[in-house]
Design a protein with these regions (language model features):
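Short secondary-structure junctions and interdomain/linker hinges
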Residues: 75-78, 96-99, 124, 128, ...
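Short acidic/histidine-centered micro-motifs embedded in hydrophobic/aromatic stretches
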Residues: 19, 30, 70, 112, ...
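Catalytic and GAP-homology cores of small GTPase regulators
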Residues: 81-198
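Alpha-helical bundle/repeat cores within regulatory domains of eukaryotic proteins
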Residues: 189-274
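Acidic, serine/threonine-rich, charge-biased low-complexity segments
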Residues: 1-107, 113, 272-274
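Amphipathic alpha-helical protein-protein interaction segments
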Residues: 42, 46, 50-53, 57, ...
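Short linear, low-complexity motifs centered on an aromatic residue
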Residues: 1-5, 9-10, 14, 130-142, ...
Length: 274
């Protein structure tokens, strides 16, 4: 009787295990379908909103041309340029029926609209002083390149804690900064910097049992900025400060402060060691 009872229980346990395995497989399939549907929904939103943006911008062409004219006018102040862009963005969004839009769709709408608009005025906004700005960026780029040749992660100049050496040279963070020039809007550029710092924080956290502090992040970020040596870094900082600084919040603002501090530290090094 005991043997029969044991076999019966054993069969039941096997049945439960197989049922559990079957349910887990089904849950995985359902999750995969949900993710696929979400991607399809996001793609559909992007296509529809992109079409709406192109349609409404065609009607705003006169206003866009006026914006371009004011950006070319040397008497237009920097703060005024930022206000002009924001007013045109807000005015254009007001032309659309956005009451039925979700918060996610409204965010996407503004991002797409920003990309279209900033693409039209990018060089005027990014290099307000034309060749002078480009020359200044080029000189700094060359100086950082020389500095990078003899700089390693264990340099006393940076004083990076040895416990973080195992994750150097932080290639994923460098790769993010190298993409900076590919983006045209200040929002997209700051997101690029945000991802760079996030990569560093994640890698540093694997080297210790606590969350890395600003004192941990900054020296590594300095190293990453030097080694990536992204072009037009000074113009990037001024561009973001002009057109996006007031919209930053939370971690985004924190990482931006760290990035600017890293660049200032590099400029100090170069000034002390010309």
């Amino acid at each position: 009787m005991i043997e029969i009872d044991w076999k019966t229980r054993n069969f039941y346990i096997i049945y439960l295990l197989k049922s559990r395995q079957y349910l887990l497989q089904r849950l995985k399939q359902i999750d995969s379908v949900q993710q696929s549907l979400h991607k399809d929904h996001s793609s559909t939103d992007f296509i529809i909103i992109s079409f709406l943006v192109r349609s409404i911008l065609e009607k705003q062409e006169q206003n866009i041309q006026e914006l371009i004219r004011k950006f070319r006018d040397s008497t237009t102040l920097t703060d005024e340029k930022a206000s002009l862009v924001q007013r045109l963005l807000d005015h254009t969004i007001d032309q659309l029926q956005t009451k039925l839009f979700t918060d996610e769709q409204l965010t996407l709408l503004r991002q797409i609209l920003e990309r279209h608009l900033m693409n039209r005025i990018y060089l005027l906004a990014f290099y307000p002083n034309g060749d002078i700005d480009q020359l200044r960026d080029q000189i700094l780029h060359q100086q950082i390149n020389q500095l990078s040749l003899n700089l390693s992660h264990n340099s006393k100049l940076l004083n990076i804690p040895t416990k973080f050496f195992t994750t150097s040279p932080w290639p994923s963070a460098q790769a993010e900064l190298l993409l900076l020039s590919a983006y045209k809007t200040p929002r997209d550029k700051i997101q690029c910097i945000y991802r760079c710092c996030s990569h560093i924080m994640t890698l540093l956290s694997t080297s210790q049992n606590s969350i890395p502090s600003a004192d941990d992040l900054l020296p590594v970020l300095i190293f990453v900025v030097i080694k990536s040596n992204t072009r037009s870094i000074l113009s990037t900082i001024e561009y973001i400060n002009t057109f996006y600084l007031n919209e930053m919040t939370g971690e985004q603002s924190y990482y931006w402060t760290q990035f600017c501090s890293a660049v200032e530290f590099i400029k100090t090094i170069l000034h002390c060691n010309p």
